[in-house]
Amino acid sequence: MILVLAESAIELVPREIWSHPAVASDARRRGKRPGEILLDRARHHPAMAGLEDGARRGRPDIVHQVLLVFQYSLLNRRGLGRVYIHTRGDYIIQVKPQTRIPKNYNNFVSLMEQLYALGRAPPHGDSLMELHRGSLAGLLEQLGGRWVVLHERGARRRFAELGAALLNSVVVVGGFPHGDFSNRWVLEKAEAVYSVGDEPLDAAQAVCRAVAAAEASAGLI
């Protein structure tokens, strides 16, 4: 299973709010420039009022939660999973299977800021995470040009059937807190669209169910 977390709400603080007191004080407290820190709704809410599409931005915690679910799963540890993060600013983050994601959120934020600064982490030796410019369309084409989507309006399948469908597929999940994919073709061109619950789920919950179904199909549970 190759997971693609798409249009993820992770980015550095945009230039237009660098001078806002909420951003400036946070950067000063952390000993960094405003443009070197992640945009975070929990810390920068007052500054985000005028940002375009602000309700869907500043949620790096979504990426953190999804990576914790996926990277520590049996599916990944047995070599049956890979994950890519596509960001709303059209960056691609490739996470190698052996990468141990920090469980502490503040440590995760520092890791991601390092990744944005250097394009890789750690700075020396073999890279475990890499960041480069790239579109969602380009990534999906690179991964074979065929994918399925987890979406609240998708078709329901029995657990075993869902697991069999996901195990060897590229699986796209939205990495944003509200709304729908801005790239409508993600749904329109998907081979299938599946729902994993009777109501909308957070990205981490959807990924958890998808991983469990794929693990069951692989005989891991």
Swiss-Prot record:
It is an enzyme of class 2 (transferase). It comes from the Archaea. S-adenosyl-L-methionine binds at residues 174, 179, 196-201. Its EC number is 2.1.1.-. Keywords: Methyltransferase, Ribosome biogenesis, RNA-binding, rRNA processing, rRNA-binding, S-adenosyl-L-methionine, Transferase. The record marks 61 as: Stabilizes Arg-59. Pfam families: EMG1 (PF03587). One of its GO terms (biological process) is rRNA base methylation. The record marks 59, 100, 103, 107 as: Interaction with substrate rRNA. It catalyses: a pseudouridine in rRNA + S-adenosyl-L-methionine = an N(1)-methylpseudouridine in rRNA + S-adenosyl-L-homocysteine + H(+). GO terms for molecular function: rRNA (pseudouridine) methyltransferase activity; rRNA binding. SUPFAM superfamilies: alpha/beta knot. Belongs to the class IV-like SAM-binding methyltransferase superfamily. RNA methyltransferase NEP1 family. Methyltransferase involved in ribosomal biogenesis. Specifically catalyzes the N1-methylation of the pseudouridine corresponding to position 914 in M.jannaschii 16S rRNA. Homodimer. PANTHER family: NEP1/MRA1 (PTHR12636), RIBOSOMAL RNA SMALL SUBUNIT METHYLTRANSFERASE NEP1 (PTHR12636:SF5). This is Ribosomal RNA small subunit methyltransferase Nep1. It comes from Pyrobaculum neutrophilum (strain DSM 2338 / JCM 9278 / NBRC 100436 / V24Sta) (Thermoproteus neutrophilus). The gene is nep1.
